[in-house]
Amino acid sequence: MSITGFSHKGRGVGVRDHQLILPSVVCSTHVSRKIANEVGAITFAHQNGCGIIGIDVPGVDNFFIDLANHPNVQSVLVVSLGCETIQGPELLPKIIRKLSRLLVIQESGGASGTYESGVRQAKQLRDNFKSEKARLDKLIVGLDLSRDTPNLSALKTGLTAAGFEVVVESEHAVSEHNLSKLMSAKAQVVISFPDENQPPTGFPLIPVINIASTSPLHMALASEFDLAQGSSVDEVIELINKVANGQKTKSEISGIGEIVAPRSVRSV
């Protein structure tokens, strides 16, 4: 099956056409949420601000850059406070500039002024840089292995034979952390095998196909998973193609999932 995605200029071709409202600091997450809700964009809450130190400063900075430059992103509005560790004006030049804008709350009339300007600028970005449909020559499929997956070898072989590039992340037992790393690897679709004691999850920028185990929790939440334990490789590939061509996953429909910025240093 051929895949038709969205051409996002320097970001490449994605399978979703998301606008990202990127709060550069915890203090701007509330305003970012209001703007995103008004214009139908994606945003996220996080706890990163003046308290991040050491290697987490470039680490979180690079994570924000990866988010903003992901192929599933159409355009970006960075919302900064003005006195944080990771400064919005320093972040913006590292993002695809033509499709990005910056608002600084302390320079834009406070929260209310930033909200009004943010809604206006987000709409202008969407209207001025409309995405064009384009054929996707290479689909990067991420595998979140938060639990043991008996048929992993057969799955990887099948996905590769189907023409997909496969990226695997299995460091964490909590899917959210693995999903963040798969995002940085530019995975456009993710297959998630959540831990038996964890519910299905998602990632706002990336469609996540959740495959259940036979644990009591997963059986109780069976309707929230896209596929059951024991689904064949052919069934997985068929669903990947459908999702890449626009069919929404269960997590996309329900709106579940968070963006978690990786942290290494304990800080206040």
Q: Which residue stretches match the model-derived regions?
A:
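Metallocofactor- and cofactor-centric catalytic cores in central/energy metabolism, strongly enriched
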Residues: 1-193, 199-268
